[in-house]
Amino acid sequence: MRIRSLGEVARLARAGLVRGDASSEIRTAVIDSREASPGALFVALQGDHCHGIEHADAALKLGAAAVLCDPGYSDRHRGASIEAPSAREALSTLAGAIREQEEDQTAAVAVTGSVGKTTTCAMIDAILGSSRIAHAPRASFNNDIGVPITILEAAPETEVLVLELGTNSPGEIAARAEMARPSHGIITEISHTHLSGLLNLEGVRREKFSMLDYIEGDARWAPVKWRRSIGAAASRFRWTGPAGDLEVRRDAPGSVMVIDRLRAREFLLPYDPGPDWLLSCFESALAIVLDFVEDPGQLSEAIPMISIPPLRHEIHCVCGIQLVLDCYNSSPRALKSEIDWLSRSTSSRKVAVVGTMEELGENEDQFHFDAGRHLASAHIDLVFVCGRGAGWLAEGASTGDGQVIHIENNEQGVQQIIEQLQEGDTVLFKASRSEGLDLLASHLETRLIEERGQS
């Protein structure tokens, strides 16, 4: 965001100036007091363990210019303060007003989808970063706090703002898109996720496609397999995937073929995507990037800058064993993609540690059973199951010839897994974040090094 006075920020946020100099400069916004810097607006919100107002003075000591808080909370800190009926809502109001003022100077790319949002954002940011000043979310900042913070913390010189729009319930993406005012948008994937709020696949489709209604122009991208479901409106969109406007196929090892039908050309790029979901993310990222960078040579130079976010197909090699951590989140589509990758691997044995996929609604038992059955059909040699969905997963996985072992807790699980592992194994960890498989994998890695030595 460009520098603005505290008075203007208060007006844009529909807040009132309680204390402080209205002419003081506001350069950014933070919700974590430890990230405060000179000129920052510290937004004091209720957190999981405490209220941000408890850390307002700490933010001010680090240079924060003012605090945005709920009514009456100004008495609980010493510095400049503005109050709004709801600080959380004021944060979104402020970000929306800033975007309205700056949209002509800063393009905004909105990314949503059931799988790969954060990874696609990271890819877009990395590739664009070689030629444009881009700003992307620092993590999965995709809710009513993360999206506005990403907007407000962008440097004034930002040319392309990359935003991740998430959802749990109908209408949330529309609200975030209205605030973000995107010039470009991409739906990475539509599959069974957040069914507790979105109910079914059609609910997911409607919610994701709602983002594209807020984009003027042609830069509305979606997976081609949904083209028929849109009917006559399909001509309003661009499509990724087989026979779509942009398609990316695996080619020789370490490269992909880009079929850019929109511009009537084909070219190779140096990229090894790994599982199918990462290939889809790369395809989605390219769909957006090609509107800014058309030269394949320039793309080839930028691709090595791509860094996949933590716990997304994160590979650790220890003691001759490959540990693959893809446990930031999980869904039927994402799990299938990782199982297929594991099945194609050349490791001596294929091992999967899988746990509950959350927010799958009333049919969650069937989704887990089907995932277990896919483990069986993919000929995974050894399957460990854990969490609330363990029974359903085990039932499906037991339809094959592989061994299935139930894990009761992480401590027991480390011992059970380490007793089975052999040099040359590849071990996939996949579950929703609440299962804590990242911690199990970390403890397993430590034990392997202690007992077998680093190799």
Q: What residues fall within each predicted segment?
A:
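Active-site beta-alpha connecting loops in nucleotide-dependent enzymes
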Residues: 47-49, 308-311, 328-402, 452-455
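Acidic, Mg2+-coordinating active-site environments of NTP-dependent enzymes
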Residues: 10-12, 74-77, 184-322, 347-348, ...
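Phosphate-binding loop of NTP-binding sites
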Residues: 10, 90-221, 229-233, 290, ...
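N-terminal leader/targeting and accessory segments in enzymes
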Residues: 1-93, 97, 344-345, 374, ...
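ATP-dependent carboxylate/acyl-activation modules
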Residues: 111, 310-314, 434-442
